[in-house]
């Protein structure tokens, strides 16, 4: 896996919208730190804070602030098909929101990567 751009504790205003109608073009990992609205492959979702998502390159997605501000940690990366398969075999649910009980530890790891 090759990590590209990384962001830690980014906060955006109520008008924030990130839109990838054809997908982000590479893998995108998000640690959502505030309530947010997502459109994931045409399905509307409301996510709570402490939700992780690991998007594949061609997954259509759009996300925005739910109430006031949107905050997240994130990184873009590329990986080989073998690396993706290894993560899937370890239980990584790509393109699927998942609550985490370890948000603080995960955020600290992303901060150290940045």
Predicted regions: what they are:
Residues 88-114:
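Amphipathic alpha-helical segments enriched in hydrophobic/aromatic residues interleaved with Lys/Arg
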């Amino acid at each position: 896996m090759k990590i590209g751009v990384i962001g830690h504790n980014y906060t955006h205003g109520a008008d924030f919208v990130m839109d990838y109608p054809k997908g982000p073009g590479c893998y995108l990992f998000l640690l959502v730190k505030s309530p947010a609205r997502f459109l994931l492959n045409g399905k509307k979702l409301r996510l709570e804070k402490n939700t992780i998502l690991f998007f594949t390159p061609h997954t259509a997605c759009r996300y925005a602030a739910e109430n006031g501000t949107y905050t997240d940690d994130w990184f873009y990366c590329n990986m080989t098909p073998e690396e993706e398969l290894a993560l899937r075999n370890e239980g990584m649910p790509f393109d699927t929101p998942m609550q985490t009980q370890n948000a603080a530890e995960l955020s600290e790891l992303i901060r150290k990567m940045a």
